[in-house]
Amino acid sequence: MKQKRNLKLMKFWRHIVYAISTACFLFFSVGGAQAGLRISDRNSNAYIGLLIPVGPAHYAAIMKKFKKIKSVRVGQFEYQIGSIYKIPVVICIQPFGGEYTRALTAQVMVDHFKIKALLYPGTSGAHIPPGKMHVGDIVIGTKQVNFANFYMSPTGKITPDEFSGKSSLRGYQYFYLNKNLEKYTACAARYVSDREELPSWINGKYKIQKPAIYYYGIQGTSTMWLADKSFIKKTDDVFHEVDEDGDWFSATVAKLAKIPFIEVSTISDSVFEFSGNGVPPRGEHRKTASQITQDISDKIILRVIKTYGYNLLNKKYSYPLRNPYPVSFYRTPTDPRGLIDACQARQRATS
């Protein structure tokens, strides 16, 4: 009898252990599956990332088209999730100024969302005198350079990057825009420029009211704000940048992530046109020059999203390993050289 009772007890506890094991297995399996679903759900939605400069605080053109779904806070940065022209986008307005800060927001964005391209509409200061460049002109970032990354010899000679003249940055010293992306941006810039009329006061005595487009722009990035024309010439002789306040740092984030980076900057000030810090005097006008020019860059990026957003989400665009254009293209950058021929018909169809 005692042996039978022991056998029954053993069977009872065996059932209990089996039930507990099964429950644990199901709990962790379902929990793991749910966690997996949550992670894959977050990563299954592809977005275009939009980097918005903190200044000028003028985002109306973009925000009017943006249909917000929700906000997501990641660390110190807040991201707005939604769509523009039915294209899924993530927007981040950097919390405070500076290229480094914007690149940090870009890195966190790329790490936490499935970003397929980074777009940056900005304003910048001219490094070329009037007659060639004016306030309101549009610069496409065909080449991105960090013109503050140099060695200066005891005699004042500038050598790019390190004093040896050999860059440790390798393929990250300069960035070149993919040729297809160049066409997309050129078409969008031309579409906006054709419909834009600058106020006569914005270019002072020059009275230029139609923005020129630097189709083959060498965009310069640094954390310097230069009003010294002799120093501008010094860096320009080496790096050939046409403007300052580009976003080489965010371009680095994009290339590391193997996604496209498109930057469009509109010239908002020029020490060659105006005295002091080169900012056009606002007078009694409703908008500042920086707000007017930020609007232009925003409209161009909106046009890129509207016309080519689906392509950016679904196609691959590699970075050119070397300069895709002859040096002569950069010497006469306002000549499109057939860049916009194929897209004019498409733009008419989608206007």
What are these regions (language model features)?
Residues 53-57, 223:
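Short polar catalytic/cofactor-binding loops
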Residues 57-68, 72, 77, 93:
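N-terminal carbohydrate-binding/catalytic regions of secreted carbohydrate-active enzymes
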